[in-house]
A protein has these predicted regions:
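Bacterial N-terminal signal peptides that target proteins for export
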Residues: 1-8
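Hydrophobic h-region of N-terminal signal peptides that target proteins for export
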Residues: 10-20
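Short S/T/G/P-enriched beta-strand
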Residues: 21-55, 108-127, 131
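Short, well-ordered beta-strand segments
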Residues: 55-74, 114
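Low-complexity "stalk/linker" and mucin-like segments enriched in Ser/Thr/Pro/Ala/Gly
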Residues: 68-88
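Extracellular/luminal low-complexity segments enriched in Ser/Thr/Pro
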Residues: 82-96, 186
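A short beta-strand micro-motif common to beta-rich folds, especially ectodomain repeats
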Residues: 95-107
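Eukaryotic scaffold repeat domains enriched in small/polar residues
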Residues: 120-421
């Protein structure tokens, strides 16, 4: 038997084969093209590629399972896609339309890749289909300065109100259901300036509290009972100065943005600190006041900096790319929050420096509240609320793609409901 440095050659070959077949964070796939425009009845071929890495050229994956709008192979309504990646749009598909193409890639560190098909010449459009509000400053109004919105395990809305020092629960239709925790204060289960609430797979509610002597992360049961505190004030690893956004990965680990420490911290569900990534600085992977975050089905992490851009990282915090730089010719754009859907799309809430009257104007003359991008950072469309003026907003996306967008104007505070037309 042949040997190399005392090791049987057959064992070296077996080890090399195993390494080649084991996906690492370097064996990432991408989709080409990542966005395409077709006419009704038109077609577009997509392909998945395993990216080149050190001493390894780009290569085709062993197999790709294609779907259209989550339907394997697609159908006559949304279009079909073959094993060769050729998408065919129906001749009678309504326009404008946005179609999601997904490839499940064998042997890739990121299991899924998503591409976007824009059908027709116009930009995809969202329509306000409902909503509700309270009159700001009245005795009946509970909300004073609503800040963050999410959906709990029962499909109800959780709204963090920084000025009221409370986290409210409403039905999607606006019926008040109660509060999370014990109201304003700095004791356990109380809030000073709550920013956001997010639920884990069991329905437990995790919250960020921003200012005061005790910025921290708190955990409550699904029915709102206090459970524990972690991530208290400080600059050391595992500590928080100004918590803002939260999200869970597929393993149940909690990711939390820290605006002032300029990083993302990762915790076990019980609160044990695991690791962190990011820092203040001018480099590509550095942050500039990180506010919100969203994890897709690959556990890739999207982090929006308030001053831009938004950055995408792999699950270990390795930088991938940036998008949404916020530098239009007519002035700066500020990105307050980010959320996402199950098709890997990212939704950024935006405004200009002028606040109420500073909404970003779209090319259709409407004020933009949300900018939608696909998983690869390609711009998809602008989304406008019917509220003409509002401060910084936050949005959440339901499993069916419905957007619930939180707002506060000079006289109203509430939620608008939007669906893609």
């Amino acid at each position: 038997m042949k040997h190399v440095m005392g090791i049987p050659l057959v064992l070296l070959a077996a080890a090399a084969s195993l390494i080649a077949q084991t996906p690492t964070r370097y064996h990432r796939a991408t989709i080409k093209p990542s966005i395409a425009r077709v006419a009704p009845g038109g077609q577009q071929r997509f392909k998945a590629v395993i990216l080149a890495t050190r001493l390894m050229a780009a290569q085709a994956p062993k197999s790709v399972k294609w779907s259209v709008n989550d339907i394997p192979g697609g159908n006559a309504q949304v279009g079909t896609i073959g094993a060769d990646g050729l998408y065919r749009a129906p001749l009678n598909i309504p326009v404008p339309n946005e179609v999601s193409v997904r490839g499940e890639v064998e042997g890739s560190a990121n299991r899924y890749v998503w591409g976007t098909v824009l059908v027709g010449a116009a930009e995809p459009a969202y329509k306000v289909v409902g909503g509700w509000s309270e009159d700001v400053g009245t005795k009946e109004a509970r909300m004073r300065e609503p800040h963050g919105i999410s959906i709990d395990k029962d499909g109800n809305l959780l709204i963090a109100d920084q000025r009221a020092g409370r986290i409210f629960r409403y039905t999607k239709a606006g019926k008040f259901l109660g509060e999370i925790g014990n109201g304003p204060g700095s004791e356990e289960g109380q809030f000073t300036e709550p920013r956001y609430a997010h639920v884990d797979s069991a329905g437990n509610i995790y919250t960020t509290d921003l200012k005061g002597d005790r910025p921290r992360l708190q955990v409550f049961s699904p029915d709102g009972k206090f459970l524990r505190i972690f991530g208290e004030k400080g600059i050391l690893p595992g500590r928080i100065l100004r918590g803002h956004g939260l999200w869970f990965d597929s393993k149940g680990r909690l990711y939390a943005t820290d605006v002032d420490n300029m990083r993302v911290s990762i915790f076990e569900p019980g609160g044990k600190f695991l690791s962190a990534f990011g820092k203040d600085g001018p480099e590509a992977a550095d942050f500039n006041a990180p506010h919100g975050l969203y994890l897709d089905a690959n556990d890739d992490v999207f982090v929006n900096s308030y001053y831009g851009p938004t950055k995408k990282f792999d699950p270990e915090g390795q930088y991938l790319f940036s998008f949404a730089h916020g530098d239009p010719p007519d002035g700066s754009v500020f990105f307050h929050s980010i959320t996402g859907d199950h098709r890997g799309n990212a939704y950024l809430t935006v405004r200009t420096k002028a606040g109420y009257d500073g909404a970003v104007e779209s090319n259709r003359g409407r004020k933009v509240s949300i900018a939608k991008y696909n998983n690869n950072g390609d711009f998809v469309c602008n989304i406008s609320m019917s509220v003409p003026e509002h401060t910084e907003s936050w949005a959440t996306v339901d499993t069916d793609g419905t957007i619930y967008s939180l707002f506060k104007s000079k006289v109203k505070a509430g939620v608008e409901i939007l669906k893609q037309q």
